[in-house]
Swiss-Prot record:
Record's cofactor remark: Binds 2 Zn(2+) ions per subunit.
Binding site for substrate: 61-63, 93, 277, 308, 322-323
Pathway(s) per entry: Pyrimidine metabolism; UMP biosynthesis via de novo pathway; (S)-dihydroorotate from bicarbonate: step 3/3
Highest taxon, organism lineage: Bacteria
Name of the molecule in the record: Dihydroorotase
Its biological purpose: Catalyzes the reversible cyclization of carbamoyl aspartate to dihydroorotate.
Active site, per annotation: 304
Alphabetical UniProt keywords: Hydrolase, Metal-binding, Pyrimidine biosynthesis, Zinc
Entry-linked SUPFAM superfamilies: Composite domain of metallo-dependent hydrolases (SSF51338), Metallo-dependent hydrolases (SSF51556)
Family: Belongs to the metallo-dependent hydrolases superfamily. DHOase family. Class I DHOase subfamily.
Cofactor(s) needed for function: Zn(2+)
Amino acid sequence: MNYLFKNGRYMNEEGKIVATDLLVQDGKIAKVAENITADNAEVIDVNGKLIAPGLVDVHVHLREPGGEHKETIETGTLAAAKGGFTTICAMPNTRPVPDCREHMEDLQKRIEEKAHVNVLPYGAITVRQAGSEMTDFETLKELGAFAFTDDGVGVQDANMMLAAMKRAAKLDMAVVAHCEENTLINKGCVHEGKFSEKHGLNGIPSVCESVHIARDILLAEAADCHYHVCHVSTKGSVRVIRDAKRAGIKVTAEVTPHHLVLCEDDIPSADPNFKMNPPLRGKEDHAALIEGLLDGTIDMIATDHAPHTAEEKAQGIERAPFGITGFETAFPLLYTNLVKKGVITLEQLIQFLTEKPADTFGLEAGRLKEGRAADITIIDLEQEEEIDPTTFLSKGKNTPFAGWKCQGWPVMTIVGGKIAWQKESALV
């Protein structure tokens, strides 16, 4: 099916929001211009809505294989499509881990059969993510690994991390890191700060993250490797990443929507839906994350979509697993709380969710360019809705944002020229 989207707006190559039509033919973007006509295409009048590149998320947890009670590739990618994401990168903390040919081939087969959006799987750095034996990077790259990470646990052994970075550099691949110094975690379930003290909870100190990032940055410099930092959350982390970039070290970084919107002061009680890793930090940390995003220290926004069951989250804040679901709330949360409040511009938000992650990892995505795959999201910037977890397509309903009123909701998502999801009656 060919589609002609009429009367939309998009961000052009100069970074300006302008009027446009967009023609999709044979799964590709055929033309982006005003006043397009086409005889062999279904016309969809988007009536002034935003025509955006499909959103790109480099940090997601689909749970399959091994955690299908939390999420599956099918439910997770449907949720991604509903959130406007057309390319997502799946973390390897599954069971089994994609750490060898057999496991990666099985994962790729599942993706091919079940995914509703483009899914790029990470390869594990170490076998079973146990930290003691490196995987075969060459084989995992051959089988389509997006990059290498032991996300969820991090690589504690510096010698192992250096060896991994050297091997990844030879393959022109990135090493992506969840940064925690295990000896500093202190069995914490929240940030070590006012909230942990008030509720008598073990806290995770900020230095737990920043000291690990500092170590890895020096290792990356020694290995001449592209090193990407997951979910930055502290002022100290922003500082060391900024200094590393100024020194010319190949480091990039991401921040989550929840760390941009919330801090520990926003936690109403010991609610497990506010438990994520890294935890919500203090006001100064939150301000540093915004500053880092604006000055280029932090390159992109990634959801860290981490679904869990209601039963798991009901165990209380100390026993419940870390993580919140993120696909279906990311854009409206960021648009409402950052763009509408003048913290960043709409153009910047689009870049942080599309071209910045795509360019950082060399993906042919994130831009509405003629000849590229038609990965497109239509967003109604005027639509206001209340976040209702019962409507999520994700199996995970675990969100701290239930009841929040937000504007800027995706209404249609196109992947490879096919409609992957659309809001009923939104474009008729």
